[in-house]
Amino acid sequence: MAKDSHTATHDRGLPADLSAPAFVDGWKMRALVVGVIFSLIAAGLAFADGSLDHVLRAWVLGMMLTFGWSVGGLALLMVQYCSGGKWGLLLRRPLEAMARSLPLVLVYWIVVALNLKRLYLWAQFKSDIDTTAALKVGFINELQKHCMDFKRPMLNTSMFWAVSLVCFAIWFLYAYRLTSLGLKRDADSPANTPYWIKKFENIAGPGIVVYALTMTAAVIYWVMSMDPTWFSSVYGLLFLVGQGYSVLALGIIVAIALSKAEPFKTILRQTEQHDLGKMTFAFVMLNIYLGFAQFLIIWSGNLPEEIPWYLDRIRGHWGIIITLDFIFHWLIPFSLLLSRDIKRNKKRLTLVCQWMIFAKAFDLFWLIEPNFKDAARNLHFSWGILEYVAVPVAMVSFWIAFFCTRLKARPLVQTNDPHVAEILEPEHVHA
């Protein structure tokens, strides 16, 4: 018969040293080495391919993946401040480190912004005269001309820079404000905790709305506008959910890895790990729901303005990729996270989360590459296509090194928090 037993004594407490373990420096060095190696591989592939086109396309993938962690980490931090919960005590410092890694994402974005004509069809045409000439020689079709002419007040270089920089400024402001106040909260008296809880709620509540709007604007310009004919009312929401999907995966990996030493060895209990696994499962479900709902509505509607976007990603061997995307991105994580044992097992949950990050990158490949004329409905091998491995791995590696620097800069646990005492209580398990 099952019985309750304590897994720890009542005298547990936080260790005196709350700084990140020394092995985080090892993570940083390994990430830098991997980044350099894959940068060299990317350069070699570009030489073999004879073009930088795939380098820049893969660069967008790497930028969107790291952007999702930085801005998505900021968003999840704000959600935690509004909702509360013990899980926030585990992820708060890693989420802050993600948000404070945003400067590197800005550097990545600048590379994209300086190469608009190579990545965005609309950037090649500044007026109706230009699109008319391109239509006559067969470079674009009627739908592309109509959409670019109609959307020109929005899809132009000046607006791309202006909207993007305003979004970055807002994200930087929120990241700085929330992370700096976090340090002030730790330095304050526990008696003022209710004041700090209210203050963070007042900042984070409106911040979530601002995040949703600015993130949607950013992904419309950075990814959606690669095909100027495409429009979707849930595109921003798909990326919002996708960011939650990948941020939780990375956050769990970091938390479990940190639990090999103090202070996370003390505070990461099976209960909170299980809770994080359930949250991740929820994002997996929401992710496939939105993606499939959009596909079903557009496919059944079969409108000539909408259906080509999916045909570009299904025909010409792309059907293999979309099938694998469904399996990688949803079916495998869904099936594995159904298991309670996997969610409570550190090694297995880490493997699932690592797979989810790979699946997210694979999904971004399916979203980005078919936007280009040489790839739409024509999946084929070239040296350039391998850039989708080399370039993102290098960019993610450098981002991880930057993230580790940010993580080392502050104590890993926010001590002035009412959940500290709760998370240090003995954990009850069923024997």
Residue ranges of each PLM-predicted region?
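N-terminal regions that are enriched for targeting/export leaders
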Residues: 2-70, 155, 422-431
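Transmembrane-helix bundle segments that line or gate the permeation/cavity pathway
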Residues: 3, 53-56, 63-187, 207
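TerminUS-proximal long segments
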Residues: 3-7, 139-147, 328-333, 339-431
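Long, contiguous internal "core" modules enriched in hydrophobic/ aromatic residues
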Residues: 22-45, 132-136, 150-325, 342, ...
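Juxtamembrane/interface segments at transmembrane-helix termini
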Residues: 47-55, 60, 79-92, 119-121, ...
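Non-cytosolic membrane-interface motifs at loop->transmembrane helix junctions
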Residues: 56-62, 91-93, 228-240, 311, ...
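Hydrophobic cores of alpha-helical transmembrane segments in multi-pass inner/ER membrane proteins
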Residues: 70-77, 106-111, 164-176, 241-256, ...
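Hydrophobic alpha-helical membrane-insertion segments
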Residues: 100-119, 282-291, 351-359
